[in-house]
Amino acid sequence: IFLLIGGLIGAFIAYKIPMTAMPELVAGFHSLVGLAAVFVAIAAFLNPGAFNLGSPGNIKLGSLIEMSIGAAVGAITFSGSIIAFLKLQGIMSGSPITFKGQHPLNALILISIIVITYFLCSTQSSNLFWILLSISFLIGFLLIIPIGGADMPVVISMLNSYSGWAAAGIGFTLENTALIITGALVGSSGAILSYIMCKGMNRSFFNVILGGFGATEQSASSQNKEQRPVKSGNADDAAFLMKNASSVIIVPGYGMAVAQAQHALREMVDTLKKNDIKVSYAIHPVAGRMPGHMNVLLAEANVPYDEVFELEEINNDFANADVAFVIGANDVTNPVAKTDPQSPIYGMPVLDVEKCKSVLFVKRSLSPGYAGIDNDLFYKENTLMLFADAKKMTEDITKNL
């Protein structure tokens, strides 16, 4: 009965949540997985007889180790996912929150978790069990707050991995083979995806685990924004450039997701293809707010898979393209990632959009992206800013083609 009730509630929430809020939903569900692991561990520790693990104060050693690991990882997953949810929802600042001695403190707490687990297994003290849970909740909080907004897709992937390992740990405690297998699958796939994404962003995998990447001090140019001239246009200008192009590369980002412009974009592309214009889609590995965010939206709009390319597959094509149509992709197109060592996104591979003959950038304003820094692409000679809602602008361009 409870499985049915929970399943219906989950299905209702997932059905009602718009695609733009999917990252927040994923983070929220991850927190529930972690909390469930904590509750199961507490129940097993307080009443081990109900789980055939022994008696209070005399729990089987192997079960106690599994229980402790599952509880610790579950607590880390819960508090970390809550912080990720708050950052994604805008309730908490998406900028990195750092303080002096943060990494040594994180390392000290992680070592403390190992030491306390050892003594907990030796003494089976309830006080140590509650201390273990408390500092695990704390380290989950501390691991996520220093991670910058531009890197949230990696955080979501990493928390997905944590939730899997938490489930697997509790699966061992309950001697539930299905829970062990599914938890291990989720944990390992999440870890592999995180590693692949980190390589694509030129980030260290261990920095993700310890927390704190994306926290570099901003450059002076980012902190002291000067009024620089930009060229702005309208749908007529954009349609004229596209009609006279032989190749167009579409660069979707979170702005497309917010405006739900993927279907309008597909219609525009279909019109371009009828005019014998070659069109491709360039997807950055961390575009959007979770892994594969743009791919999901384009698939929803029935965009053919053979037109969608990852960064390393299409980046060299920008230099030969006539028009790049950037629709809400901000940080992943920022050239300062290649030129400014003080930038928070320095070293992250970005799409070489500025190499196109003409760049059409659809955005509501010149406000910074999720990383909180100005985009130099706005001010390039070959960039034409289209200040409007992404969906409306795309529809207007289609009418003028």
Task: List the predicted regions and their residue ranges.
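Cytoplasmic-side transmembrane-helix entry/capping segments in multi-pass membrane proteins
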Residues: I1, A21-V33, P96-L108, P153-Y162
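Structural signature of hydrophobic alpha-helical transmembrane segments
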Residues: I1-L8, S63-F78, Q124-I135
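C-terminal ends of transmembrane helices
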Residues: L8-V26, S81-P96, I139-M152, S194-C198
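Transmembrane alpha-helix boundary signature
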Residues: F12-P23, V38-P56, T123
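Membrane-interface helix termini and inter-helical loops of multi-pass transporters
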Residues: N47-L61, G90-S95, L298
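Mobile "lid/hinge" segments at catalytic clefts and subdomain interfaces of large enzymes
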Residues: G148, Y162-F206
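Membrane-interfacial segments at transmembrane helix termini in multi-pass membrane proteins
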Residues: L185-A245
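Structured cytosolic domains appended to multi-pass membrane proteins
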Residues: E226-L401
